[in-house]
């Protein structure tokens, strides 16, 4: 017989569920009721909220972009107003001086005889009216022996506008590529009306159309990000080339931005020679490795930390060489103990010559990507002009005397140029003045012709070279036209960024296709000759700078 006390103790120690847990206890009496109307209403409310959040973010982005654009317009108008005010002030001073001079003889005649002056006493010199302030201009020279070109804001735009000064007698024609582009643009239903001028129907291309197309091509590598950490692809490429040359050759780092361009030809040649020494591994090319379709369609890293995936640069020849020479310091890509403890030459250049806000390229890899592609761009420009001879007009298309009139002068002296001499001249007389005018310029703004040539080579690799046919689809112009449509018609900021990113990725693919070919220089020369009419080194030099080779066509 159990003791009464122990039974009572066990009964009291039995654990009981709290009342709030009764509803969750398994029981056939528990029923879950879902009101379909409330469920649909909740889904609708959630969708509306998500749509509201997305629209709020888009409106905020548009407001910021509009604010920046309006600020630029205000600054431009303020500068123009200040210039007009200065001119008016100068004119007023000149008018007052002339009035005072006119009144002095009259007052002296009314007073009788002129006062006697001592000839030995020095008299004050007459006041000389100050000349009006000169407009801020820049002068560049493209080819040795040619006249220089003076421009105020944009060299390409001002050069193109000068070609249409005598449009009543003749118009410029730009070659097969631009003829096909113009015809394709005129046949499109969705295309800006302001670009469909009457000149497009006279075996020519209107000023507005050629200007917008070449401006779009020239702005491909212009960063549309507003981050202070960004560096233009041209400046990033200069930093990489100089850091590589100083690291491998033992030279001191440049002390100014102008010194970055000194001996740029030998610096590129040293890098090209080392690239050729890497061997012929089919897996190591000039292309990046994309881990997702989203990253393949954008320029900036998809990851939020400013870095690409680990294997993004791994199969790129220039990156492999930079890591092997310890110019780019990334711990994940080197097996040398203590290699990352050495000096970062690239960071030393960017922090000393540009800004302290620019982080090392290994941490902010957008600059590394744009810099590597900028190096590819400059390599192609250098190789195209390395052995250029400009004195032999064999099959030359461009005759600037007929285009520009008596203002243009060309030396008829026969001159033989050494290797790299034309390229060095171009860096000194063309790139350096423009760089002092705009220190954040991109490679495509300097050499839009190379962008067109690379895009054309990239389009050609998609077709079978053994099959000869004429491409009538005009798809190679689509990416350029998409940017024009979004910029001038739809004006959707988000879609404009997408269109610009697609065009820049296409240029990267074109540069890679050109450098991966058996003879990159021959590929560029062939495209310039067949698509744009370039016949000799003189034509190719001007095509790289202008992006076109105009000739005169009579108006009928």
From Swiss-Prot:
Give a yes or no for keyword Zinc-finger in this entry.
no
Q: Which domain of life is it from?
A: Viruses
Q: What is its main location?
A: virion
Subcellular localization, as worded in the UniProt entry: Virion; Host nucleus
In this chain, composition skew of type Pro residues spans 121-132
Query: Per the record's keyword annotation, is Zinc included, yes or no?
Result: no
Map out region (Interaction with major capsid protein/MCP) in residue numbers.
1-54
What protein does this entry describe? Capsid vertex component 2
Q: What is the lineage of its organism?
A: Viruses, Duplodnaviria, Heunggongvirae, Peploviricota, Herviviricetes
């Amino acid at each position: 017989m159990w003791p009464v006390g122990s039974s009572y103790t066990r009964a009291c120690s039995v654990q009981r569920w709290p009342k709030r847990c009764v509803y969750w206890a398994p029981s056939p009496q528990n029923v879950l009721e879902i009101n379909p109307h409330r469920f649909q209403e909740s889904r609708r409310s959630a969708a509306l909220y998500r749509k509201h959040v997305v629209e709020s973010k888009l409106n905020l982005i548009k407001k910021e972009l509009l604010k920046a654009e309006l600020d630029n317009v205000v600054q431009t108008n303020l500068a123009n107003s200040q210039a007009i005010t200065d001119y008016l002030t100068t004119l007023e001073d000149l008018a007052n001086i002339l009035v005072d001079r006119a009144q002095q003889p009259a007052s002296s005649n009314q007073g009788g005889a002129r006062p006697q002056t001592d000839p030995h006493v020095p008299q004050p010199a007459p006041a000389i009216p100050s000349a009006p302030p000169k407009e801020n201009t820049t002068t560049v020279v493209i080819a040795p022996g040619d006249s220089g070109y003076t421009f105020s804001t944009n060299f390409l735009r001002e050069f193109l506008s000068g070609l249409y000064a005598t449009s009543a007698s003749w118009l410029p024609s730009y070659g097969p590529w631009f003829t096909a582009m113009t015809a394709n643009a005129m046949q499109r239903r969705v295309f800006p009306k302001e670009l469909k001028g009457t000149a497009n129907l006279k075996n020519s291309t209107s000023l507005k159309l050629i200007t917008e197309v070449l401006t779009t091509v020239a702005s491909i590598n212009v960063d549309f990000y507003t981050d202070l950490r960004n560096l233009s692809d041209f400046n990033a490429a200069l930093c990489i080339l100089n850091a590589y040359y100083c690291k491998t050759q033992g030279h001191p780092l440049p002390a100014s931005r102008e010194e970055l361009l000194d001996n740029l030809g030998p610096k590129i040649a040293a890098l090209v020679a080392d690239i050729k020494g890497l061997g012929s591994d089919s897996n190591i090319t000039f292309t990046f490795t994309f881990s997702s379709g989203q990253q393949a369609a954008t320029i900036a890293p998809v990851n939020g930390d400013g870095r690409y995936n680990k294997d993004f640069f791994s199969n790129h020849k220039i990156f492999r060489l930079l890591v092997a020479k310890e110019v780019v310091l990334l711990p994940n890509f080197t097996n040398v103990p203590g290699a990352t403890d050495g000096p970062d030459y690239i960071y030393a250049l960017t922090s000393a010559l540009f800004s302290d806000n620019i982080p090392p390229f290994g941490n902010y890899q957008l600059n590394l990507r744009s810099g590597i592609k900028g190096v590819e761009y400059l390599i192609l420009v250098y190789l195209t002009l390395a052995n250029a001879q400009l004195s032999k007009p064999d099959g030359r298309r461009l005759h600037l005397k007929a285009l520009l009139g008596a203002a243009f002068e060309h030396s008829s002296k026969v001159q033989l140029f050494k290797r790299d001499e034309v390229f060095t001249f171009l860096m000194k007389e063309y790139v350096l003045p423009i760089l002092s005018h705009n220190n954040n310029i991109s490679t495509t703004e300097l050499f839009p012709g190379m962008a067109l040539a690379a895009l054309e080579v990239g389009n050609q690799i998609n077709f079978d070279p053994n099959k000869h046919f004429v491409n009538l689809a005009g798809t190679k112009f689509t990416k350029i036209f998409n940017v024009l449509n979004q910029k001038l018609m739809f004006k959707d900021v988000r879609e404009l960024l997408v269109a610009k990113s697609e065009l820049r990725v296409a240029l990267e693919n074109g540069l890679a296709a050109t450098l991966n070919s058996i003879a990159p220089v021959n590929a560029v020369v062939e495209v310039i000759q067949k698509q744009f009419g370039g016949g000799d080194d003189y034509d190719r030099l001007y095509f790289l700078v202008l992006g076109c080779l105009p000739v005169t066509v009579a108006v009928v």
